[in-house]
C-alpha cells in the first residue's frame, strides 16, 4: 500500500516587508493621477453642515444637504462601478493564470516522467 502522507512542499522564504522609508518613497514617486490618489478623491467636496447652519435659512440648508447627499451618492455609485469592473478584470486574469499554470503543468509532466523513467 502507498503512503497516505503528503509530501511537504518547501516554499521559498518571503522577502522582508518594505521599510517606512521605502513606502514613503514609493508614495512620493507615484504620479498624481495614480488610482491610489484619484479613486476616492471627491470632485466637489460638500460644504460642512455647521457652516450652512449659520449662513442659510432652514429650507436652503436642507436643499444644500440634499444636493451634497445626491452628489456623494453619485460618486459612490461611480466608485462601485469602477470597483466592479476592476474585480471582473482581476477574476479574468486569475482564470487566465490558472489555465496557463495548468498548461505548464501538463507540458512539464511528460518531461518529468521521461526523465524519471530514462
Curated annotation (Swiss-Prot):
InterPro entries: UPF0449 (IPR028227). The modification Phosphotyrosine is found at residue 63. Residues 81-109 form a coiled coil. Keywords: Coiled coil, Phosphoprotein. It comes from the Eukaryota. It holds the Pfam family UPF0449. Belongs to the UPF0449 family. This is UPF0449 protein C19orf25. It comes from Homo sapiens.
